[in-house]
């Protein structure tokens, strides 16, 4: 059993927040197959800030999905706080998760969100501290190994998040520049796990049950 803040995770089977896939129906299917903690697909802090109906509809969740985490992406501290508070007050997820790993150009380059935050640990600390202060539920963070092969900083980023009050770290062991190509470097996950005192969830290249058991 692992504790993420006050949330007990009894199995080491966690559903990732896959954009366009991890909706309520899919999450319930995964729950029936043995997933314990499930993550809802990411939503934009700005879209919630401006009350975008399509985004608000994406927040739908049911009690049978618990424990459940709702992931948010963005780059503005105030928008993150507004979105996190709205989600907690309306949907009551067990966990709020902050996306610092999405590599797609629309998010990382245009919006300077997702994995773009890896380049700015000071801003990471500011965002996480503000969200932790704004909500009552645990706050977790999803990161990558780094922006590119010349800036592998997962350990620094993980420590920064822990210092800011994050209750757990998920790391996709690829860089932003890799996207979903190449292979995940599980040694990076090991380094992060050894560097922090909060739970670390490994992510990347889990295609089969055998992969998960590794």
Predicted regions and their residues:
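Flavin-dependent oxidoreductase catalytic cores
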Residues: 1-214
């Amino acid at each position: 059993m692992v504790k993420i803040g006050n949330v007990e995770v009894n199995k080491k089977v966690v559903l990732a927040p896959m954009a366009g896939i991890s909706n309520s129906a899919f999450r319930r299917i995964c729950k029936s197959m043995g997933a314990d903690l499930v993550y809802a697909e990411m939503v934009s802090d700005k879209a919630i800030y401006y009350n975008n109906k399509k985004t608000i509809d994406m927040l739908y969740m049911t009690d049978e999905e618990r424990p459940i985490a709702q992931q948010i992406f963005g780059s503005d501290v105030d928008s993150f706080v507004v979105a996190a508070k709205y989600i907690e007050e309306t949907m009551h997820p067990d966990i709020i998760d902050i996306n610092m790993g999405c590599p797609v150009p629309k998010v990382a380059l245009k919006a300077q969100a997702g994995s773009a935050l890896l380049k700015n640990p000071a801003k990471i600390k500011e965002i996480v501290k503000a969200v932790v202060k704004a909500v009552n539920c645990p706050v977790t963070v999803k990161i990558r190994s780094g922006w590119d092969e010349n800036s592998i900083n997962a350990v620094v980023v993980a420590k920064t998040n822990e210092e800011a009050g994050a209750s757990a770290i998920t790391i996709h062991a690829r860089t932003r520049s890799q996207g979903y190509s190449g292979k995940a470097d599980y040694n990076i996950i090991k380094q992060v796990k050894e560097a922090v005192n909060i739970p670390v969830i490994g992510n990347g290249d889990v295609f089969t049950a055998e992969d998960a058991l590794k």
